[in-house]
UniProtKB/Swiss-Prot annotation:
Signal peptide: none annotated. This is Acyltransferase easC. GO terms for biological process: emericellamide A biosynthetic process; emericellamide biosynthetic process; ergot alkaloid biosynthetic process; fumigaclavine C biosynthetic process. Keywords: Acyltransferase, Alkaloid metabolism, Transferase.
Length: 479
């Protein structure tokens, strides 16, 4: 077991990185992801760890934001945070040879693969560096644990959401993979690349509309207690774990089944030029069939369900942000509310098309103006964390989508000994979210949903749902 601090390959002097209004408002928690590799015999685990460190050091010189300390802004009365960087900045980096740990009872890489990688069943503090407690000095922007298992490697990444969104962390992952592969091939990584123009322009997300009222964003609320942590620290939001029994299930959409689903909906539209995207089609299918499986029409027949999905605004602004922008730029969510009776109507291509059209309209109507409205609300609030979401996710009827299917994490080659990841998963058990995971080489992707245990069984028996997606596994909690 080894724990160190991987510093920037080119140290920086003392500096402060100012966070944007969207960075300040976003959920304050550590997002977590795991990358699983099948290790071949061309490199030893010692070699792999050495070159992972080498590659990470160069990557952090390109993206120092994730090597920073996140801390309160001095004398701020609005609970603002900032990123502090300096010559000793780096990322806590822990290596655990799980083959030598009594606590590792989860088997070899082939064992995990046979069970379809049940990473959420592995206790957090075995797989990840334990989450630090907030202190006056702040918190690390990110920390990493490399787990060596028999036949494989599991990289567990935690990053503070205030630093960047999922696209931002994928930029770090892409660069880390590239520099590690070069280091493994040549014995040393390349020099740090110069960031693309606009990659660090967080200041552009401080300018919002004036005199915004909460009525303009009815699914949000102004509430100083909504996110307040009992400790009094505002470096992290209060945790609100689900206390009722639930299941997290994983399903797979192949490229052919995605095409079949989209084709079925296109026949209703009778216009192939307006064919729904994969995300629109899958969102409609899951929203309908999971609502039916949860029997929401029985428990709340006169109610409604809110659908939300996060959007990447990088290309939606004028001028657009580069794809390499580091920061949060995925709020507000696109939102649409429909009667539960409509959502739970018998599943046909026509009824699915109704939901897909609603999802499309919501995303098209969420524009840069929407983003500037939210920024204006944050700027005028007594504290940046007073702006909170007013969603009723699981066990309520609302459904949120986090779509990372267009992130190329499954296709990045990390070099000899590692290759490309065989599995990428979120470890977070966020309430009521549908995750769309990165596409594989064949164009398919996995999804992960949270619902009642009995609802999963109904989904497994749903012939229409399983026509398009294949059940992989499920884990029950709070049973």
């Amino acid at each position: 077991m080894e724990e160190t601090n991987v510093k920037l390959s080119v140290p920086l002097s003392e500096d402060v990185i100012k966070l944007s209004a969207l960075d300040q408002q976003i959920m304050r928690f550590y997002a977590k992801a795991v990358f699983i590799f099948e290790r071949d015999s061309s490199k030893t685990s010692i070699d792999i760890v050495h070159h992972l460190k080498q590659g990470l050091a160069v990557t952090l010189s390109e993206i120092p934001d994730l090597a920073a300390t996140i801390a309160p802004v001095p004398n701020s009365h609005r609970k603002d945070l900032e990123l502090r960087i300096g010559p000793n900045s780096g990322v806590p980096f822990k290596v655990v040879d799980q083959t030598k740990q009594e606590s590792w009872v989860y088997g070899t890489y082939p064992d995990l693969a046979a069970k379809h990688f049940p990473t959420s069943d592995i206790p957090h503090d075995i797989l990840f560096i334990p989450q630090p407690q907030p202190s006056a000095d702040g918190l690390p922007a990110a920390f990493l644990q490399v787990n060596i298992i028999d036949g494989g490697v599991i990289i567990a990444i935690s990053w503070h959401h205030s630093v960047c969104d999922a696209r931002g962390i994928s930029i770090l992952i892409d660069a880390w993979a590239r520099h590690t592969a070069t280091s493994l091939a040549n014995g040393k990584p390349d020099l740090p690349a110069t960031p693309a123009e606009g990659s660090r322009d967080r200041w552009r997300l401080d300018h919002g509309l004036r005199e915004v009222t909460i009525d303009q964003l009815p699914e949000y609320t102004i509430d100083s207690s909504a996110r307040e942590d009992p400790s009094g620290s505002y470096l992290l939001d209060r945790e609100n774990p689900v206390t009722v029994p639930y299941s997290v299930s994983t399903w797979y959409f192949s490229a052919s089944s995605l095409k079949a689903l989209r084709d079925a909906l296109a026949q209703v539209e009778n216009d192939e030029s307006t064919q729904f995207t994969k995300v629109e089609a899958v969102s409609a299918l899951v929203w309908k069939h999971m609502s039916i499986a949860r029997q929401l029409d029985r428990s709340n027949p006169d109610g409604s369900s809110l659908f939300t999905t996060r959007l990447d605004f990088r290309a939606r602004t004028k001028p657009p942000f580069p794809d390499t922008f580091i920061g949060n730029i995925n709020e507000p969510t696109a939102r649409v509310r429909l009667p539960i009776a409509e959502i739970c109507r018998a599943s046909t291509p026509e009824s699915l098309t109704t939901l897909a059209e609603a999802v499309r309209a919501a995303t098209e109507n969420t524009t840069e103006q929407s983003m500037r409205t939210l920024i204006g609300l944050v700027n005028d609030a007594p504290a940046v964390t007073d702006v909170a979401w007013k969603y009723n996710y699981f066990p309520g009827p609302d459904l949120g989508v986090t779509d990372i299917s267009n992130i190329d994490a499954m296709k990045k080659n990390w070099g000899a000994g590692l290759g490309t990841p065989t599995c990428v998963r979120s470890y977070s058990r966020e309430t009521g979210l549908l995750y769309l995971f990165p596409q594989d080489d064949d164009g398919g992707f996995e999804i992960q949903v949270q619902c009642e245990v009995e609802a999963v069984e109904r989904l497994k028996a749903d012939e229409t749902f399983t026509r398009y997606c294949e059940f992989k596994r499920a884990s029950a909690y709070n049973a």
